[in-house]
């Protein structure tokens, strides 16, 4: 919430406390709590404009270490994502889900944790890369109406995002 306060104070015309009162933040500590929080979104979805799940695969990564059946952990993630997708369609709700990546030892490339499951269920996929100096690049990898490959470079600053030149 500290970052939210910083952005709201710098950008918002509304009172920061009034804006904060419209947020619902749930801090979860394990996969079960995450699943419960996702289920609980049904209770307020019709009044919400946006739901953010950051990161959908954080606990999946921990679960699959001790899970002999990696598929069950991934199915649990997929159920959470499909529940949010269902609410998004029913209530015209924006849903943002972040994912973690890992370096594939065979190709030495970053791959999404959980494979293609999240990509399959997502309407849009944006890859964000970090460069020296705090610069970042957001690249559109999947979208229902736009071609993949469009990108924008930016830097996170005190009052939001700032566009940067094309060199990383």
PLM region descriptions:
Residues 1-68:
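Conserved inter-motif catalytic segment of the P-loop NTP-binding fold
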Residues 10-13, 43-46, 72, 144-148, ...:
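Short, low-complexity, polar/charged sequence segments that are solvent-exposed and flexible
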Residues 17, 31, 35-38, 71-82, ...:
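Amphipathic alpha-helical transducer elements in NTP-driven molecular machines
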Residues 37, 41, 48, 55-57, ...:
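Small-side-chain structural scaffolding
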Residues 53-83, 93, 100-101:
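Conserved P-loop NTPase nucleotide-binding/switch module
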Residues 86-168:
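Phosphate-binding/switch region of NTP-binding enzymes
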